[in-house]
Amino acid sequence: MKTFLIIGAASGQVPIIRKVKEMGHKTLVVSRAGPYPGLPEADLSLPIDVFDTSAIVSAAKEHKVSAVLTCQSELLLRVAASVAEELRLPGIPPSVLARIGDKATLREHCRLRGVETPKYWHVGSLSAFLDILRNVEESLVVKPVDNAGSKGVQFIPAPRNIDPCQAEKIYSESIQFSSLKQLIVEEFITGQEVVVEGAVLNGKVTPLMIGESWNIEFPGIFVPSRRFFPAAISDDAVRSIYEIDALIYHGLGEFFSVTQSEYIISARNGQIYLIDAHLRGGGACIESHIIPLVTGLDAQEKVVLSALGLRIDIPRSLTVRQHAGYVTFLLPRGRLLDALDPGGVEGIPGVHYHGLRGLTAGREIPESKNKSARFGPIVIHGDSRKDLYQTRDTLKATIKLRVETNRGICGPHWE
């Protein structure tokens, strides 16, 4: 039995904690104090700030850990990489994360490898930000270079016409989510969003599956409402996207990681643009639940084995066993009038797993600003894309939540 250090105890860490224990090992979780769902799952937990690398290293040495893991968070991934390097344990080298670990360095990495990204500007001051808005006509997206969970991402539909005070507010609200105090201002591309889950093993890239992504149409934020696998796009488009994905991750070094890349196929000219890339598996249960459902590959088992430095193999090609994906929803700001019975959701045919907890009458729903405001995910599966839509429609008909808002009684936003 080995001891695994897990950094973080939020819901995204629960599947990997369970997987480590299922494989016969012990878990040591470090996290700030709080009602985090990973804490009761752990064999042992310590109240350590997840960004206090030196304290984490000291605890790891004291408890003689054999492996370091974290899931679904770029910010914690950097911490895990630094801790593993300090302890001389397997992991992604910090030097690799420095190349593609934030949105600015990722775009430079893509430029050097011939991967198309939307036109962008890298800014670190209000004056530079305002200068861009004065000189650009196209719609723009503002992104902190090192944010997480879409925090600080904002849309500007008409940059030249924006009021200077509003522009300054957008800058301030976005820059607060960057520890580097830097932003990416990017041309807004309309089209079909596509997501690729892959694996990189010692510099070789293997695509695992490809899906489509749709956002909830909610004012001012970019939040995926659902992601369905496999994608209903042409074989030529799939091949092109897989070739681009290989360019991004090929030859980065001797390590293993599940990867996730987000693309958009332009509605204007069919050009494929990279939007984001991650040296981690997809959140919202993609790595833990959806990859195994679609492909039969237990991705998190590979993650656990590689963290111990053990040899792993990734099949060069995987067949689609079934369709699967997740759906989520947002609730408007206000007071929740109804309670949701989780058992009623679990009993719906096609529902594999859901993360709906705490939806009780009287709960105050705050303003939705980023991905963390979503309710779910609800993982669904079936023999076809039609089955997924049927299950989604049943969920919408079942989850009849009412919220008392300043505009009257409103329900969930699914689309």
Specify the residue positions occupied by each region the protein language model found.
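ATP-binding N-terminal substructure of ATP-dependent carboxylate-amine bond-forming enzymes
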Residues: M1-V96, S127, L310-D313, Q322, ...
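Short, conserved charged micro-motifs
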Residues: A55, N161-A167, G334-L340, S384-T391
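Glycine-rich phosphate-binding loop signature in dinucleotide/nucleotide-binding domains
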Residues: A59-V65, R134-V136, F177-S179
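A conserved helix-loop-beta module that forms one wall/lid of the active-site cleft
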Residues: E85-G152, P157
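Internal nucleotide-binding/catalytic subdomain
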Residues: V153-I272, G281
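Short beta-strand-to-loop capping motifs
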Residues: I156-A158, G198, F329-P332, I378-S384
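Active-site "cap" helix and flanking loop/linker of ATP-utilizing ligase/carboxylase catalytic domains
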Residues: R239-Q260, H278-D338
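Glycine-rich active-site loop/lid that clamps phosphate-bearing ligands
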Residues: F329-T360
